[in-house]
Amino acid sequence: MSQLSSTLKRYTESARFTDAPFTKSSYGTYTPSSYGTNLAASFLEKEKFGFKPSPPTSYLTRPRTYGPPSILDYDRGRPLLRPDVIGGGKRAESQTRGTERPSGSGLSGGSGFSYGVTTSSVSYLPVSARDQGVTLTQKKSNSQSDLARDFSSLQTSDSYRLDSGNLGRSPMLARTRKELCALQGLYQAASRSEYLADYLENYGRKASAPQVPTPTPPSRAPEVLSPTYRPSGRYSLWEKGKGQALVSSRSSSPGRDTMNSKSAQGLAGLRNLGNTCFMNSILQCLSNTRELRDYCLQRLYLRDLSHSSRAHTALMEEFAKLIQTIWTSSPNDVVSPSEFKTQIQRYAPRFVGYNQQDAQEFLRFLLDGLHNEVNRVIARPKSNTENLDHLPDDEKGRQMWRKYLEREDSRIGDLFVGQLKSSLTCTDCGYCSTVFDPFWDLSLPITKRGYPEVTLMDCMRLFTKEDVLDGDEKPTCCRCRARKRCIKKFSIQRFPKILVLHLKRFSESRIRTSKLTAFVNFPLRDLDLREFASENTNHAVYNLYAVSNHSGTTMGGHYTAYCRSPVTGEWHTFNDSSVSPMSSSQVRTSDAYLLFYELASPPSRM
């Protein structure tokens, strides 16, 4: 006997009907309209009302809208048609809606509306399942990502056996040979999944009473796991192969599915959810950031979350689950980051929808959100206006850094935050005013004309060169107490462990925005930035490990990533779901937009 989820049955049910109306969402993604103009035509026509799968450009199971109640889902609160579920008895001829449960906010990533069963309505569940209080969930899309989630949450009461007797007696399975072949092929493809096989092994292949697994007692302290840990997150995986076979969501225990170190190389691709290449590019760069990767794989972030009294920790948790899934998947897997996107757009509503965004802005919002959730400072002290101008610049910089850490202290900041020194010197009296500010990245200007090729050091020198502030840009001198002509200069007071350099390729003017396509030659190793330090230091040499590229124009383009594995040291191209090896000589291109450098180990003292 073979066991088959009613999810497959619902999938083939909806595949028959192709006349469901479509609407254009406010975010540019076509989604199936659950309520067409002919919804109230006939109550007997409910069986003929199906849902189309989502188009290829969107892999979310339903249009997600996050924000004020005024822009929430237009279908919120409406009852959905209940699916037919075959199970131990003849299907009732009449259909009635159950009592509607209050729908969630949608921010949790759910994709369906649950409905209970009223005492007066006819139940479509088997008697055993009805006694257990099983509820049904109607999906708004029967796409492959829906099936992936449904396979990972199968219940024995929501399944039935496919045999010759049921084929002859059940009107819902009396399909044409073509439809039955399609159903059988889909089931066979799903049966090859190790996750569905584990389910059948745990719950048995016969229609027996459900076995309740013994709950695992909670551990006293967060367990520090090796980088080969397989997460228990719900990220859908897609295997490359014949017809892109469906693989179930990962929801397994660490001990059973631990992979060896050879297969855990972080070479899984990320599915494009619809103009989300900017997000995928940054996520792959961060996934290959050695210390951030270890922070997620070893679950060290749980210690910082446990010390935090904040209610919002979902972004860090989903980010860590995504990194864990990438690094515990085989190189042929493709991970869908839809759950992570749900949380980042909840933190930063500007990323709601599927418009193309800037990768640097996304990186800033993401790092800021992660930093806020794992900030070790529970209660920030009140800011004071202590005057430190009487101190030498080096001491003033250390005091300003100490004050910054009193308010902002996290593992994310330990990696990415540096300190920038800016000085203003009055040309009349010679008074020099210094300010120390933290930075997460440095935006470097590019020479616009006359130089078809520039070097990264040229960009750094252009960023730190003295700039004369005159005319309308004159600042007020504290000693002269008047607006005076001044000279501004930047230098780096404190170098971060991870230095992100942003090449300012997009130039804005009053008329239009243009893109600078000049080739910037940057070193892959031994980037020496000591000449830009505000004080003497011997620890300012960096090695490149990731590049976020932008190809195209300001009107439209595409983001990819070149990353060097922290395990093997080999370079790979990450183009959404496609991952391929590359040579280090191919890393330098005119599409380089964000450069990720790692501080080299200090030279050993003999």
Curated annotation (Swiss-Prot):
Subunit: Homooligomer. Found in trimeric complex with MDM2 and MDM4 and USP2. Interacts with CCND1; the interaction is direct and promotes its stabilization by antagonizing ubiquitin-dependent degradation. Interacts (via N-terminus and C-terminus) with MDM2. Interacts with MDM4 and PER1. Interacts with KCNQ1; counteracts the NEDD4L-specific down-regulation of I(Ks) and restores plasma membrane localization of KCNQ1.
GO biological process terms held by the UniProt record: circadian behavior; circadian regulation of gene expression; entrainment of circadian clock by photoperiod; locomotor rhythm; muscle organ development; negative regulation of transcription by RNA polymerase II; positive regulation of mitotic cell cycle; protein deubiquitination
Cell location: Cytoplasm; Cytoplasm, Perinuclear region
Lineage of the organism: Eukaryota, Metazoa, Chordata, Craniata, Vertebrata
Reaction catalysed by this enzyme: Thiol-dependent hydrolysis of ester, thioester, amide, peptide and isopeptide bonds formed by the C-terminal Gly of ubiquitin (a 76-residue protein attached to proteins as an intracellular targeting signal)
Binding, Zn(2+): 426, 429, 477, 480
Activity: how regulated: Cleavage is inhibited by ubiquitin in a dosage-dependent manner. Cleavage is blocked by ubiquitin aldehyde.
Taxonomic superkingdom: Eukaryota
Region (Necessary for interaction with MDM4) location: 1-201, 404-504
Function in brief: Hydrolase that deubiquitinates polyubiquitinated target proteins such as MDM2, MDM4 and CCND1. Possesses both ubiquitin-specific peptidase and isopeptidase activities. Deubiquitinates MDM2 without reversing MDM2-mediated p53/TP53 ubiquitination and thus indirectly promotes p53/TP53 degradation and limits p53 activity. Has no deubiquitinase activity against p53/TP53. Prevents MDM2-mediated degradation of MDM4. Plays a role in the G1/S cell-cycle progression in normal and cancer cells. Plays a role in the regulation of myogenic differentiation of embryonic muscle cells.
Family, per entry: Belongs to the peptidase C19 family. USP2 subfamily.
InterPro entries per the UniProt record, alphabetical: Papain-like_cys_pep_sf, Peptidase_C19_UCH, Ub_carboxyl-term_hydrolase, USP_CS, USP_dom
Gene Ontology CC, one term: cytoplasm
Keywords, in A-Z order: Biological rhythms, Cell cycle, Cytoplasm, Hydrolase, Metal-binding, Myogenesis, Protease, Thiol protease, Ubl conjugation pathway, Zinc, Zinc-finger
Active-site residue numbers: 277 (nucleophile), 558 (proton acceptor)
Annotated protein name in UniProt: Ubiquitin carboxyl-terminal hydrolase 2
Gene3D superfamilies: Cysteine proteinases
GO molecular function, one term: cysteine-type deubiquitinase activity
Every USP domain range: 268-600
UniProt-listed PANTHER family: UBIQUITIN CARBOXYL-TERMINAL HYDROLASE, UBIQUITIN CARBOXYL-TERMINAL HYDROLASE 2
Segments of skewed composition (Basic and acidic residues): 90-100
Gene name of this polypeptide: USP2
Region (Disordered): 53-112, 207-228
